[in-house]
């Protein structure tokens, strides 16, 4: 068979295979078009589960007569006109395929009128070439789309449709998701002439809980914990159910990105990880969450039905969601009870979001003092739903960042998961070739401030790891891998509260021998101080989190070596352990460039100013310029 161009109807039917899966898909596409048209009221009429009729009526801006024919054509849209528009999508639709695809597998009639027109017009496509016919009609300002006899000309697709009840159930779920996304729009859903759902508009934030209760039910609202976090251009808001209620509300999982309903695996993983110690493996969390992000930082054009997105900074988004949900759950969780040596019950310590000195003398993002509310406990289990919600709202912390989102430099990510420097750096331990129980420390007579000490300007880098720098009115060679090891050790020296663990995207499973498992259990507190969360069961271990300096390391190799080292010591200090780890970390760069060298030295000068004043052996080698000049001048 020779290559030939497909007829328009066949091409549209092929495209419909991706967009129009069932009647619920048609409802989703058409209602999203109504939302893009600025409608404040949408009426949805369904007959026989959508197989016989789907009618969507809205009071949006309408479509002009001259645009009606194009509205049913493929790749025709008013949403975008350039690649720049595609990279910053805010509208629900943008491909211009939905109406053409739907009209190719049904009898579609589009009636519309704009405020500027005196009369309405009706359009429908028919025939092998999908020719569009336009005629006058009576209609108020807005649009009505009628989809009759869905899949009438594709018997194979119609055969796979389920029962009327099942198909309407899917439509009901789609409408529920859309109603949760747009509180300001009134939506009515009817089936076979009977009004099934009536979601009244709730434009005022104080009315949102009423809409939430009508969609998710009073049981979810009673156990809902309000959440509202902001960091730069990232904002997350909504509700999460407390763990006790999540066990019976697991079907309530709604997530939106820029008001677009999503089933994104990264977001689901972050939420699930926040609940991981509060739910069993077969239980699921319940939540209604809205993530707002700069549209330039998310790609929505990666799924035919736009159910999934791709984030440019996936790790940032994952950790941001995890931290937000974890904080709310920790603040509202019931304290666990431990038994002390005297047999008395004592309250276990609970993690609280706080500003603390962490790895490398840094701080976590500062919350506004006005939003800091102490945790409220009550011994009475009979609190009303209103009281629960008001307390949850008061407890909800909102974090702000002063600098805008930086895609290239990842500045926001470092602010989120890495704390900011303080003026007085901690003393740095001297690396030693021998694994000494206690590392020797460099001391200074007076406090050092990073702003007053600098190695000098980086001139160039000699591969693989030597930087030529200006140094004390001359030049010197600096070994970057040695400087990197000093920096890692400074970041690994734990403060009194310990290093902050950063959850792994995928927990690491390890198989340990008997000595390693014993060492892990014996030094569990020490590992926690280093920000390492390692759960051991017999000879199996699960690594769930590590401190920030270890995030980019080969943990599959490093952790067993670390446990082997710990098995040789009954007791060991955190400083000695930090020294050992820093000497066994791999370099982040095989071959360094100038920008990487500048960034490294900037961090070293900030966290380890002692190295500038008294460089240790192996770090810096001054170059005798006078001897070189004497050779050139034959002196």
From Swiss-Prot:
GO terms for cellular component: mismatch repair complex. One of its GO terms (molecular function) is ATP binding. Transmembrane segments: none annotated. Gene3D superfamilies: 3.30.230.10, Histidine kinase-like ATPase, C-terminal domain (3.30.565.10), MutL, C-terminal domain, dimerisation subdomain (3.30.1540.20), MutL, C-terminal domain, regulatory subdomain (3.30.1370.100). Residues 369-389 are annotated as: Disordered. The keyword DNA repair applies. One of its GO terms (biological process) is mismatch repair. This protein is involved in the repair of mismatches in DNA. It is required for dam-dependent methyl-directed DNA mismatch repair. May act as a 'molecular matchmaker', a protein that promotes the formation of a stable complex between two or more DNA-binding proteins in an ATP-dependent manner without itself being part of a final effector complex. This is DNA mismatch repair protein MutL. The keyword DNA damage applies. Belongs to the DNA mismatch repair MutL/HexB family. Keywords: DNA damage, DNA repair. Residues 377-389 have a biased composition (Polar residues). Disulfide bonds: none annotated. It comes from the Bacteria.
């Amino acid at each position: 068979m020779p290559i030939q161009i497909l007829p328009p109807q066949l091409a549209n039917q092929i495209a419909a295979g991706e967009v129009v899966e069932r009647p619920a898909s048609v409802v989703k596409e058409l209602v999203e078009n109504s939302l893009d048209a600025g409608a404040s009221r949408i009426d949805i009429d369904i007959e026989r589960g959508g197989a016989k009729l789907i009618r969507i009526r809205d009071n949006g801006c309408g479509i002009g007569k001259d645009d009606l024919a194009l509205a049913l054509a493929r790749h025709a849209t008013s949403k975008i006109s350039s690649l720049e528009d595609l990279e910053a999508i805010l509208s629900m639709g943008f491909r211009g395929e939905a109406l053409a695809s739907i009209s190719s597998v049904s009898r579609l009639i589009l009636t519309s009128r704009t405020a500027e027109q005196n009369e309405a017009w009706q359009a429908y496509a028919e025939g092998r070439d999908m020719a569009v016919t336009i005629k006058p009609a009576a209609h108020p300002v807005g649009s009505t789309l009628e989809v009759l006899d869905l899949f009438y000309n594709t018997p194979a697709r119609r055969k796979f449709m389920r029962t009327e009840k099942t198909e309407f159930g899917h439509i009901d779920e789609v409408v529920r998701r859309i109603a949760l996304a747009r509180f300001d729009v009134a939506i009515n859903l009817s089936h076979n002439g009977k009004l099934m759902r009536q979601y009244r508009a709730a434009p005022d934030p104080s009315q949102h809980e009423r809409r939430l209760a009508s969609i998710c039910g009073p049981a979810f609202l009673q156990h809902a914990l309000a959440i509202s976090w902001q960091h730069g251009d990232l904002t997350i808001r909504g509700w999460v159910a407390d763990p006790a209620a999540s066990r019976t509300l697991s079907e309530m999982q709604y997530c939106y990105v820029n008001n677009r309903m999503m089933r994104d695996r990264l977001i689901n993983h972050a939420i699930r990880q926040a609940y991981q110690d509060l739910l069993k493996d077969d239980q699921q969390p319940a939540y209604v969450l809205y993530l707002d992000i700069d549209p330039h930082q998310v790609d929505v054009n990666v799924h035919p039905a736009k159910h999934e997105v791709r984030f440019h900074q996936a790790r940032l988004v994952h950790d941001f969601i995890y931290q937000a949900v974890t904080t709310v759950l920790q603040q509202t969780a019931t304290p666990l009870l431990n038994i002390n040596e005297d047999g008395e019950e004592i309250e276990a310590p609970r993690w609280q979001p706080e500003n603390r000195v962490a790895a490398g003398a840094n701080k976590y993002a500062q919350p506004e003092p006005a939003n800091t509310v102490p945790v409220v406990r009550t011994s009475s289990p009979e609190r009303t739903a209103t009281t629960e919600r008001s307390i949850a709202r008061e407890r909800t912390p909102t974090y702000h960042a002063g600098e805008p989102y930086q895609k290239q430099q990842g500045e926001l990510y470092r602010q989120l998961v890495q704390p900011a420097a303080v003026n007085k750096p901690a003393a740095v331990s001297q690396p030693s070739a021998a694994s000494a129980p206690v590392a020797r420390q460099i001391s200074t007579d007076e406090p050092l401030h990073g702003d007053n000490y600098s190695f000098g300007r980086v001139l160039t880098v000699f591969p693989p790891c030597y930087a030529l720098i200006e140094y004390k009115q001359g030049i010197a060679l600096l070994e970057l891998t040695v400087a990197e090891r000093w920096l890692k050790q400074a970041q690994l020296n734990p403060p009194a509260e310990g290093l902050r663990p950063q959850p792994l995207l995928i927990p690491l499973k390890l198989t340990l021998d008997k000595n390693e498992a014993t060492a892990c259990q014996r030094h569990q507190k020490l590992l926690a101080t280093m920000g390492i969360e390692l759960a051991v069961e017999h000879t199996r271990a699960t690594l769930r989190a590590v401190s920030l300096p270890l995030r980019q390391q080969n943990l599959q190799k490093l952790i067993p070596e670390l446990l082997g080292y710990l098995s040789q010591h009954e007791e060991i200090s955190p400083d000695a352990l930090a020294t050992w780890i820093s000497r066994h970390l791999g370099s982040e760069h095989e071959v360094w460039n100038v920008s990487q060298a500048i960034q490294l030295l900037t961090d070293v000068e900030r966290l380890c100013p002692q190295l500038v004043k008294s460089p240790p052996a192996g770090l810096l080698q001054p170059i005798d310029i006078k001897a070189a000049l004497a050779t050139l001048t034959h002196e």
